[in-house]
């Protein structure tokens, strides 16, 4: 646990250092390119929560969508932590007015079922509590 905290502290210090350097020069530099990381990683889950919140907010569908499967998760370090996510999402039984869709069941009626493949890139600065959608590309499957 101590090793994990040391690594996390080092990462935060490095990102902050790079962040200041990038702000000085005006263009983010890639400190570490995208690498595969575990789907269960806390920041992947946080980025995915944000991506789905933004997807549902922008969608014209009457129902919320929720993640069915995470196909790929990667992290890149620039002036922030960037998460590349490939996911399958599906329409739930919860209408948007219901709010939170964490516990919503997926549509069972064949006429209402809808599955979508999405690629999201989310920028995160956890030390500033900032999240930003850099890319959202989705298509029906």
Swiss-Prot record:
Query: Which positions does the site annotation Reactive site cover?
Result: 26
The primary site where this protein sits is: secreted
Q: Name one GO cellular component term.
A: extracellular region
What are the alphabetically sorted keywords of the record? Cytoplasm, Disulfide bond, Protease inhibitor, Secreted, Signal, Thiol protease inhibitor
Question: Where in this protein does the record put region Secondary area of contact?
Answer: 76-80
**Keyword Nucleotidyltransferase listed:** no
State the Gene3D superfamilies in the record.
3.10.450.10
- SMART domains from the entry? CY (SM00043)
Query: What is the top-level taxon of the source organism?
Result: Eukaryota
Question: Where is it made, tissue-wise?
Answer: Expressed exclusively in testis. Found in spermatagonia, spermatocytes, round spermatids, elongating spermatids and spermatozoa.
Cysteine-cysteine disulfides: 94-104, 118-138
Show the InterPro entries listed in the entry.
Answer: Cystatin_dom, Cystatin_sf, Sperm_Mat_Cystatin
Compartmental location: Secreted; Cytoplasm
Q: Which residues form the signal peptide?
A: 1-24
One annotated GO molecular function is: cysteine-type endopeptidase inhibitor activity
PANTHER family under this entry? CYSTATIN-13, CYSTATIN-8-RELATED
Q: What does this protein do?
A: May perform a specialized role during sperm development and maturation.
Q: Which family does it belong to?
A: Belongs to the cystatin family.
* Protein name (database record): Cystatin-13
Q: Which gene encodes it?
A: Cst13
